[in-house]
Curated annotation (Swiss-Prot):
Record bears the keyword Isomerase: no
Gene that encodes the chain: SERCA
GO BP term (any one): adaptive thermogenesis
SMART domains listed in its UniProt record: Cation_ATPase_N
Class of the enzyme per the UniProt entry, highest EC level: translocase
Assembly description: Interacts with SclA and SclB.
Function field: This magnesium-dependent enzyme catalyzes the hydrolysis of ATP coupled with the transport of calcium.
Designated name of the protein: Calcium-transporting ATPase sarcoplasmic/endoplasmic reticulum type
Organism: Drosophila melanogaster
Length: 1020
């Protein structure tokens, strides 16, 4: 049934043909079950374990590695017998990497809560219905309830379907709708039709929503929606239709994978084609097929060299470490890739209640009469400090701190706050914080009374819990509450009938303490309290009270005001009909006005500075709230979203105003607006869609079930720690303290993580370029193998992986939150950086090949071959004068490969130091600014020595121990990489400063001169 809220009770019942007393017939129930289906949310079909496993291999880099492993495995089958073991090492290692990655991926997905499944927890098991097949109320399974059923609910019940209320049996009916709206204050319901067909859920006061809870009262209603037709069902549908989007980093890595696959393909084909002339060399037994397979193996080695196998593991580790740092700042990250996405957040869409504010109502201003002479009067206006439920704060009058005990009227006001109240404050030992027990508004009045301490209670020596209830205890020794006249909509007030336990200034008889909406209470006031006297309250005085109350309710504060009054001579209890709430109005008469208190959900202290930081960082903050426009704008002025006197036209929209715009105007509104008030969940989703269409990266906060679709749709969904399970499981991040400032800290951490990630990704890529160059040069020049696939795997995974991970600990730049957010489509590598890393990579490759060639040609421990012999080594087995006296087995000697591998490892350790900063010199940013990097380099070298000096491992990796002379040569080949990168950084700094790279070049020239001078001295 559409627009059930706008229909009268009779129209709703007639729509389904429901008898208002006896409910549906069995035939109607069967027909409706067939028409509408069961009252349950469909179960989400989970993926099988094999589907999840296959998904882990749906990645281009993984597919390339898998192909390399399969080819290596096939080629290993054709190896000579003595080489069979080492030949199988490479494909096995690759497969182990892939299996480990898949296991981790599947484990993460299986453990991730499903937001859609979490919705099921709000479905009740049973419901109470009235049907014609049985007399009275019967319990049925909730899923058997159909539209048209008469359902009865009472305190503690979970609503089994969307229900149009037809009758309320109690004085009031309060419903906790926090799972849907995120607002903690329970909603008072009624049976009247709401004629507005566009009313938002918060305004549908005659509807009970499925999954919400009855906080107080008892009622009956007709079911108007079941299953997917309920408000919670529509949220489920929207969530299931929301597609997951890849993070900017995932998109960049996908692009990198595509480019890499193309480059690998071209280079592999080129290497294989270049050597076609060598296919029938004597080393291959003159067989073209064996020669083709041999060079195919080299091409596969090239593919292994080009793929940064350690990259996925390093990225995961860096992100995981980032989440630990964020957790210390109360931001719990559920989705690892979202850590990096935080770094490019350009818009934060924040809830108001509980995120920008404390979600703890607090009285900030109040007034009482100072003096009254006829129609002339003056007020005493007090201001209170403190913005939480902790009853600590000061009271000020005209900017001066005062003692409330000096004002007689404040003693009476405190008494009303305590006695006309059904709530309390409680100290949570675990959270070390005070919490409300009951309604937020009433809790604020209790805290006010404790702050006032108008009876001068001595709190010294009391613990926090006892001190927080000391004033209440004092007042309760003076008065006893006999009964309460509950709040009702017609009179908009509540009252407590109290009798004195001891004599006080208020007299010896019983009192009726009243609080409520100022207009309603003043209507029934005949007098006003001025000190200890009671004066007549004229219409002119009432107008002045309402005028000042109006000022409190508008402008910067927009306070929620309550009037406090007392009936000095109330009716006797036996003259009251306490069972009929419609008569309560008659008992709250001849009241004496005491004062008006103004309260608000105050902004968090730290939010203003966080908004300023966001502005400096180029991040726009949009406040999205279900609160009314005036209150929301007032809070936004207090926290700096709007300036004090700023015109909010075109920058602040209510949900209805937004709906009245055309799609083009809506997009323009989202582009400039900073506040959306009185919004529905679908507004949040629409705002996210518009932001995404403008290439903005949005972070969206939420805590209710209704927020889940928007949280899932936004790039960064941020749930509140106090929010629903559905919101938390739909979000990428959960704020443990519900604090907006924690989001800003998380964004800062995200930016730092991205900067560090950029450094280690570039480090790994430049290292891989070096490996590709070394294999390409070896094949192109016809040199013996310098590096084999298993060595390349070791370097990529272990030796490179450790320093790359350590680069994730680089300290953040000091100005990181003074720069605009990076664009989501910003490339990892610019043109200049590509040149830099190609230059470094080419040197790495050349030095690696050069070290192997040095051993063959120049080393005293080597064969001292000629360059021609080295480049034509495959012809050695064919004999001939050119290889006279040369043992052809020398070309398989592990020394050359060990030299190449040692140079590669050493250069890449030094290259890791180069990656401490993109442009800063090692002189200004020395290695010890990141001790993790020094430790990882030491560990990498240790592992390298292990494979050199442990026999079993040296056999697997085909390496051998090196002499002192060989180690010195390794260092000679390696150190220039630091000098080369320092030169390139110097040029980059000069270009960034707009200066000529030639300017102040003498330092760089001197650095190179010293190196070559030392090199020459060592050769003498």
């Amino acid at each position: 049934m559409e627009d059930g809220h706008s229909k009268t009770v009779e129209q709703s019942l007639n729509f389904f043909g429901t008898d208002p007393e006896r409910g549906l017939t069995l035939d109607q129930i069967k027909a409706n079950q067939k028409k509408y289906g069961p009252n349950e949310l469909p179960t989400e079909e989970g993926k099988s374990i094999w589907q999840l496993v296959l998904e882990q291999f749906d990645d281009l880099l993984v597919k390339i590695l898998l192909l390399a492993a399969i080819i290596s495995f096939v080629l290993a089958l054709f190896e000579e017998h003595e080489e069979t073991f080492t030949a199988f090492v490479e494909p096995l290692v690759i497969l182990l990497i892939l299996i480990a990655n898949a296991v981790v991926g599947v484990w993460q997905e299986r453990n991730a809560e499903s937001a859609i499944e979490a919705l099921k927890e709000y479905e009740p098991e049973m419901g109470k219905v009235v049907r014609q097949d049985k007399s009275g109320i019967q319990k049925v399974r909730a899923k058997e309830i159909v539209p048209g059923d008469l359902v009865e609910v009472s305190v503690g019940d979970k609503i089994p379907a969307d229900i149009r209320i037809t009758h309320i049996y109690s004085t009031t009916l309060r419903i906790d709708q926090s799972i849907l709206t995120g607002e903690s204050v329970s909603v008072i319901k009624h049976t009247d039709a709401i004629p507005d067909p566009r009313a938002v859920n918060q305004d549908k006061k005659n509807i009970l929503f499925s999954g919400t809870n009855v906080a107080a009262g008892k009622a009956r209603g007709v079911v108007i929606g079941t299953g997917l037709s309920t408000a919670i069902g529509k949220i489920r549908t929207e969530m299931s239709e929301t597609e997951e989007i890849k993070t900017p980093l995932q998109q960049k890595l996908d692009e990198f994978g595509e480019q890499l696959s193309k480059v690998i393909s071209v280079i592999c084909v080129a290497v294989w084609a270049i050597n076609i002339g060598h296919f029938n060399d004597p080393a291959h037994g003159g067989s073209w097929i064996k020669g083709a397979i041999y060079y195919f193996k080299i091409a596969v080695a090239l593919a292994v060299a080009a793929i940064p196998e350690g990259l996925p593991a390093v990225i995961t580790t860096c992100l995981a470490l980032g989440t630990r740092r964020m957790a210390k700042k109360n931001a719990i990250v559920r989705s690892l890739p979202s850590v990096e996405t935080l770094g490019c957040t350009s818009v934060i869409c924040s809830d108001k209640t509980g995120t920008l504010t404390t979600n703890q109502m607090s009285v900030s201003r109040m007034f009482i009469f100072d003096k009254v002479e006829g129609n002339d009067s003056s007020f005493l206006e007090f201001e209170m400090t403190g913005s939480t439920y902790e009853p600590i704060g000061e009271v000020f009058l005209n900017g001066q701190r005062i003692k409330a005990a000096d004002y007689d009227t404040l003693q009476e006001l405190s008494t009303i706050c305590i006695m006309c109240n059904d709530s309390a404050i409680d100290y949570n030992e675990f959270k070390q914080a005070f919490e409300k027990v009951g309604e937020a508004t009433e809790t604020a009045l209790i805290v006010l009374a404790e702050k006032l301490n108008s009876f001068s209670v001595n709190k010294s020596g009391l613990d926090r819990r006892s001190a927080a209830i000391a004033c209440r205890g004092e007042i309760e020794t003076k008065w006893k509450k006999e009964f309460t006249l509950e709040f009702s909509r017609d009179r908009k007030s509540m009252s407590s009938y109290c009798t004195p336990l001891k004599a006080s200034r208020l007299g010896t008889g019983p009192k009726l303490f009243v609080k409520g909406a100022p207009e309603g209470v003043l209507e029934r006031c005949t007098h006003a309290r001025v000190g200890t006297t009671k004066v007549p309250l004229t219409s002119a005085l009432k107008a002045k009270i309402l005028a000042l109350t109006g000022q409190y309710g508008t402008g910067r504060d927009t306070l929620r005001c309550l009037a406090l009054a007392v009936a000095d001579s109330p009716m006797k209890p036996d003259e009251m009909d306490l069972g009929d709430s419609t008569k309560f109005y008659q008992y709250e008469v001849n009241l004496t006005f005491v004062g008006v208190v103004g309260m608000l959900d105050p902004p968090r202290k730290e939010v203003f500075d966080s908004i300023v930081r966001c502005r400096a960082a180029g991040i726009r903050v949009i406040v999205i709230t279900g609160d009314n426009k005036a209150t929301a704008e007032a809070i936004c002025r207090r926290i700096g979203v709007f300036a004090e006197d700023e015109d909010t036209t075109g920058k602040s929209y209510s949900g209805r105003e937004f709906d009245d715009l055309s799609p083009t105007e809506q997009k323009a509104a989202v582009a400039r607006s900073r506040l959306f008030s009185r919004v529905e969940p679908q507004h949040k989703s629409k705002i996210v869609e518009f932001l995404q269409s403008m290439n903005e990266i949005s972070a969206m906060t939420g805590d209710g079930v209704n927020d889940a679709p928007a949280l899932k749709k936004a790039e960064i969904g941020i749930a509140m720690g106090s929010g629903t399970a559905v919101a938390k499981s739909a979000a990428e991040m959960v704020l443990a303290d519900d604090n907006f400032s924690s989001i800003v800290s998380a964004v800062e951490e995200g930016r730092a993580i991205y900067n560090n990630m950029k450094q280690f990704i570039r480090y790994l890529i430049s290292s891989n370029i070096g490996e590709v160059v070394s294999i390409f040069l070896t094949a192109a020049l016809g040199l013996p193998e310098a590096l084999i696939p298993v060595q390349l795997l070791w370097v990529n995974l272990v030796t490179d992986g450790l320093p790359a991970t350590a680069l994730g600990f680089n300290p953040p730049d000091l100005d990181i939150m003074e720069k605009p957010p990076r664009k989501a489509d910003e490339g990892l590598i610019s043109g200049w950086l590509f040149f830099r890393y190609m230059a470094i990579g080419f040197y790495v490759g050349a030095a690696t090949v050069g070290a192997a060639a040095w051993w063959f040609v120049f080393s005293d421990e080597g064969p001292k071959l000629s360059y021609w012999q080295l480049t034509h080594h495959l012809s050695c087995l064919g004999g001939g004068d050119e290889f006279k006296g040369v043992d052809c087995k020398i070309f398989s000697d592990p020394h050359a490969m060990t030299m190449a591998l040692s140079v590669l490892v050493t250069i890449e350790m030094l290259n890791a130091m180069n990656s401490l900063s993109e442009n800063q010199s090692l002189i200004t940013m020395p290695p010890w600014c990141n001790l993790w990097l020094i430790g990882s380099m030491a560990l990498s070298f240790t592992l390298h020595f292990v494979i050199l000096y442990v026999d079993v491992l040296s056999t697997v990796f085909q390496v051998t121990p090196l002499s002192a002379e060989e180690w010195i040569t390794v260092m000679k080949f390696s150190i220039p990489v630091v000098l080369l990168d320092e030169t390139l950084k110097f040029v980059a700094r000069k270009i960034a400063d707009g200066e000529s790279p030639i300017y102040k070049m003498h330092g760089i020239v001197l650095m190179w001169a010293v190196f070559f001078g030392l090199l020459y001295a060592m050769m003498l």
